[in-house]
């Protein structure tokens, strides 16, 4: 199979010096050049995605000054690159949510969007249903399919005289959308208008089934009568009770149950009810993700085992790897039992397919079967061009023969609903009775692979998808030959001339085919003898993860008969989704110092990190300890960190050491939607997950003694770094205003070089309203970090039994935002101008003397905080005049990812990373080992390189380096 790697070669680069590059104005729409700060290694990383293209697109926006800038930690974002900086005139320029911190794809109504559970929804149905969906997508970096929650669904009116592009592939796959809608090809993303007949597009070859809604309760509390009340409490906390048909989690549970009936065991172990699954390590890792999505923890055990087997032909020995995934939660084990999982040895138990599965909508049955075949179904195999039968073999004690047959007949009846006919027959076995269900024949196998396929086993799944694409391709060739047969017959009947009959179809078939059709009465055309075998097809057309390249055979420009286009935005960094089978496309940091040294803290580091983990809520969807209703957070949005201090979370002087004093003037809570407030209210005072963290660090190197002294830093000192932002509220604000701006952009006639690069005039009603909402989100983030600071101080007091203020000296060094837009005054061509600076994944870096810097730091410059990746160094830098002159007072914000989170989990194991860090003297406490794997040091660029570039460029000055000794992560 092919590994797809997208390399951007379209954007020219001119080297200025060792660490500066220029993107010349190669496109006449560019108003300014691009400026990139990177060494040779970092620039190559940027060439591999759309970073440079996005920087060039930003240079086309109205009112931009000097350069479109990319910092050394830059990588592809949404519209703007992450690590991007741009300044726009406040009168003539624009404002863009994508340039402040956000990560949309326009398609025709009727387009089928594939979801996690293998059912599809029409894109126009998504606005009502997207909150419940996770969509399938193609993770290019990893080369496999993945899932993402939907950030938003946007729609826009089709402009007068606007046309759409419709493309059709060789197997009949069709997609229709606006000219500038990007689709994935083997060469990277290409706009629909640039696709030509004969080009290839990347397809996810899975048909799925339509969504069918069913309402009602499957299981409620009454099913657990007599059980410990803690069981019900546990399930309710995870929204697993009551179980309703309309909950998408039903698809996940059906998949898990299917796999459990194949390769699972429910039984007593050491007096406890335990649920265990068996299989290959990579299969169980996929299953573990599903369990974790339900809030169920599972432990994976992998070990090598020596084996020795005696057979009639000889004795064999070797090593095999055994993997087991164990769920110790009695509550979940009981739930799965109630859903139909038998307790004890399955071969000794009589059971049927659960009634709720038999009565479920087709999409639920699909998930059950895919899980079951993922465990016990045979992988699809071919002999040349012909698929061999897919088998499902089951065994039971002889006394349960009738029950075994009934069980397989249940499976057969469900399969028939998908157009899959089967045969069931007995297989000879010595100790038990064994029956086999077989899917035989090309049409049945094609229907199985295209509508059901396998789940959990990546190898089975990928091969099954490519096999389905092959069988579709084969069928399309046979259909074309059938058509040639009919044409040649008709012409021969009309003319009696075989030469004419052959001439009409010679581009499709050879003369011998026409002769067989006319003289021998051939009725069922076969593929030609030189037709690709499956293995050849997989090698030439198959991509990792089961994706396939299909040739485009028809491209049309059409006048839409509908009045709207639709877009979907996803959270995943891949920024795509699967439509009709085709792949289409304020955070901040705070540093708190202490009077403690490593010698003081090292003996208590485990206790300290555990206490921080306990006192500061963290993890996916984590909720704060403060309970505010969404109607009560307006004061937070207006006053930011000041609100938190007024409520007792910190000291009045804290506000002097925060960017903007922890509060941006002009925030308007009425500009923030109810949905955003509902998402933010329960998360206030929480860390979140992903790359957000609390880190206990030691200052291990001072580069500038004078500035370090001004910042209160000394070698050997213990400090705490906090990285978190505005949580779900900020993301929702961006989602809301992207939709608003999509509708407004044409009204203002703003150039739109990239559909992701939505913007409106800064002085427009929409622009000002968004700016007010962005300020409110920034204030929420400052309040959030202020509350966390308070709990950090309390944690130190709890562990060291000393007063945070009088004894420990726990002062804030500084707090910087790195996804924000600011109105600032800068010098351009010798004149002072007011601009709206967009910093996306970039940090403000003002020089000595600037009035926006706290008085205590005004002589040395603004502190700049650069977090490294988990287990690597972080840095404190100082703002410089160089930054003011070159980058609108901006510098980098961190290391920048080189592996997606999912790629990191495949390459690293969380427990091994944790253990390795512990050997290096770094204690890690995390909500899950998955998060540790996602944030492995190897998933990021080398922060030392990034910092070296900005230092050499003179856009920040090195002050101090810190190394971690303890990490708390969500």
Swiss-Prot record:
Cofactor(s) listed in the protein's UniProt record: Mn(2+)
GO molecular function annotation: DNA binding; endonuclease activity; GTP binding; metal ion binding; RNA ligase (ATP) activity; RNA ligase (GTP) activity
Gene Ontology annotations of biological process type: intein-mediated protein splicing; intron homing; tRNA processing
Positions contributing to Mn(2+) 1 binding: 103, 587, 692
Binding residues annotated for Mn(2+) 2, in chain numbering: 587, 723, 818
InterPro entries for this protein: Hint_dom_C, Hint_dom_N, Hint_dom_sf, Homing_endonucl, INTEIN, Intein_C, Intein_endonuc_central, Intein_N
Active site annotation, chain numbering: 893
Note accompanying the cofactor annotation: Binds 2 manganese ions per subunit.
The protein's Enzyme Commission number: 6.5.1.8, 3.1.-.-
General function of this protein: Essential for tRNA splicing and maturation. Acts by directly joining spliced tRNA halves to mature-sized tRNAs. Joins RNA with 2',3'-cyclic-phosphate or 3'-phosphate ends to RNA with 5'-hydroxy ends.
Note: Ligation proceeds through 3 nucleotidyl transfer steps, with 2',3'-cyclic phosphate termini being hydrolyzed to 3'-P termini in a step that precedes 3'-P activation with GMP. In the first nucleotidyl transfer step, RtcB reacts with GTP to form a covalent RtcB-histidine-GMP intermediate with release of PPi; in the second step, the GMP moiety is transferred to the RNA 3'-P; in the third step, the 5'-OH from the opposite RNA strand attacks the activated 3'-P to form a 3',5'-phosphodiester bond and release GMP.
Family: Belongs to the RtcB family.
Protein's recorded name: tRNA-splicing ligase RtcB
Encoding gene per record: rtcB
């Amino acid at each position: 199979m092919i590994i797809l790697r997208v390399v951007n070669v379209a954007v020219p680069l001119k080297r200025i010096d060792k660490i500066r590059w220029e993107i010349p104005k190669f496109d006449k729409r560019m108003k300014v050049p691009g400026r990139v700060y990177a060494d040779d290694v970092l620039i190559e990383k940027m060439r591999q995605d759309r970073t440079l293209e996005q920087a060039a697109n930003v240079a086309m926006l109205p009112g931009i000054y000097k350069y479109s800038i990319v910092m050394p930690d830059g990588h592809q974002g949404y519209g703007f690159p992450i690590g991007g900086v741009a300044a726009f005139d406040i009168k003539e320029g624009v404002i863009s949510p994508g340039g402040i911190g956000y990560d949309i794809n326009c398609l025709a109504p009727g387009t089928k969007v594939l979801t996690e559970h293998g059912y599809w929804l029409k894109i126009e149905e998504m606005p009502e249903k997207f909150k419940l969906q996770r969509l399938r997508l193609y993770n290019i970096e990893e080369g496999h399919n993945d899932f993402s929650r939907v950030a938003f669904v946007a729609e826009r009116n089709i402009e007068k005289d606007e046309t759409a592009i419709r493309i059709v592939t060789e197997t009949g796959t069709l997609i229709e959308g606006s000219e500038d809608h990007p689709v994935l090809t083997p060469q990277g993303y290409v706009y629909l208008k640039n696709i030509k007949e004969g080009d290839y597009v990347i397809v996810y070859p899975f048909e799925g089934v339509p969504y069918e809604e069913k309402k009602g309760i499957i299981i409620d509390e009454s099913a657990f009568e007599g059980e410990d009340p803690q069981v019900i409490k546990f399930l309710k906390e995870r929204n697993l009770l009551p179980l309703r048909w309309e909950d998408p989690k039903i698809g996940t549970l059906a998949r898990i149950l299917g796999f459990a009936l194949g390769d699972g065991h429910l039984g007593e172990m050491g007096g406890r009810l335990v649920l265990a699954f068996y299989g290959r390590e990579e299969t169980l890792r996929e299953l573990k993700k599903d369990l974790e999505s339900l809030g169920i923890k599972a432990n994976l055990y992998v070990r090598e085992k020596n084996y020795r087997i005696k057979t009639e032909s000889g004795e064999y020995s070797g090593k095999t790897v055994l993997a087991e995934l164990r769920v110790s939660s009695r509550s979940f084990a009981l739930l799965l039992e109630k859903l139909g999982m038998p307790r004890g040895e399955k071969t000794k138990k009589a059971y049927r397919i659960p009634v709720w599965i038999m009565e479920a909508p087709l999409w639920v049955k699909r998930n059950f079967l895919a899980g079951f075949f993922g465990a016990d179904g045979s992988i699809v195999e071919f002999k040349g061009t012909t698929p061999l039968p897919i088998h499902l073999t089951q065994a039971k004690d002889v006394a349960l023969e009738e029950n075994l047959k009934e069980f397989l007949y249940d499976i057969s009846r469900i399969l028939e609903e998908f157009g899959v006919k089967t045969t069931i027959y007995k297989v000879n076995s010595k100790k038990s009775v064994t029956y086999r269900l077989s899917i035989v024949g090309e049409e049945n196998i094609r229907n199985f692979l295209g509508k059901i396929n396998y789940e959990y086993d990546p190898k089975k799944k990928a091969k099954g998808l490519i096999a389905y694409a092959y069988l579709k391709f084969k069928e399309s060739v046979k259909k074309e030959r059938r058509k040639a047969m009919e044409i040649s017959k008709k012409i021969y009947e009309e003319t009696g001339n075989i030469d004419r009959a052959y001439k009409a179809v010679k581009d499709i078939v050879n003369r011998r085919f026409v002769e067989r059709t006319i003289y021998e009465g051939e009725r069922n055309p076969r593929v030609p003898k030189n037709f690709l075998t499956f293995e050849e097809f997989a090698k030439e057309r198959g991509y990792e993860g089961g994706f396939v390249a299909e040739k485009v055979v028809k491209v049309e420009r059409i006048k839409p008969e509908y009045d709207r286009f639709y877009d979907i935005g996803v959270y995943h960094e891949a920024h795509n989704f699967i439509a009709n089978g085709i792949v289409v496309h304020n955070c901040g940091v705070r540093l708190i110092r202490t009077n403690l040294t490593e010698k003081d803290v090292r003996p208590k580091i485990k206790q300290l990190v555990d206490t921080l983990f306990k006192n500061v809520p963290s993890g996916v969807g984590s909720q704060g300890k403060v309970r505010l209703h969404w109607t009560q957070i307006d004061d937070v949005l207006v006053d930011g960190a000041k609100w938190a201090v007024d409520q007792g979370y910190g000291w009045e002087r804290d506000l002097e050491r925060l960017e903007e004093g922890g509060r941006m003037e002009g925030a308007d809570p009425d500009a923030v939607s109810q949905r955003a407030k509902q998402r933010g209210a329960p998360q206030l005072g929480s860390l979140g997950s992903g790359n957000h963290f609390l880190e206990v660090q030691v200052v291990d190197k001072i580069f500038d003694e004078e500035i370090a002294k001004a910042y209160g830093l000394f070698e050997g000192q213990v400090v705490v770094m906090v990285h978190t932002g505005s949580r779900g509220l900020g993301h929702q604000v961006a989602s809301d205003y992207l939709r608003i701006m999509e509708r407004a952009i044409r009204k203002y006639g703003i150039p739109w070089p990239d559909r992701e690069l939505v913007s409106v005039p800064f002085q427009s009603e929409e622009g000002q309203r968004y700016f007010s909402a962005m300020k409110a989100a920034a204030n929420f983030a400052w309040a959030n970090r202020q509350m966390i600071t308070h709990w950090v101080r309390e944690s130190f007091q709890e562990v060291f039994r000393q007063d945070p203020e009088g004894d420990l000296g726990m002062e804030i060094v500084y707090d910087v935002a790195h996804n924000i837009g600011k109105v600032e005054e800068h010098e351009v061509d010798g004149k002072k101008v007011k601009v709206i600076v967009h910093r996306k994944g970039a940090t403000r870096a003002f020089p000595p003397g600037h009035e926006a810097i706290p008085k205590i730091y005004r002589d040395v410059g603004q502190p700049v905080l650069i977090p490294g990746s988990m287990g690597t160094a972080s840095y404190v830098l100082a703002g410089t005049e160089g930054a003011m002159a070159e980058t609108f007072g901006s510098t980098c914000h961190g290391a920048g990812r080189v592996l997606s989170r999912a790629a990191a989990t495949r390459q690293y194991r969380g427990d091994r990373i944790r253990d390795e860090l512990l050997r290096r003297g770094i204690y890690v406490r995390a909500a899950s080992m998955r998060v540790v794997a996602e944030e492995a040091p190897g998933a990021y660029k080398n922060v030392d390189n990034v910092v070296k570039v900005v230092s050499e460029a003179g856009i920040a000055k090195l002050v101090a380096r810190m190394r971690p000794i303890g990490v708390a992560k969500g």
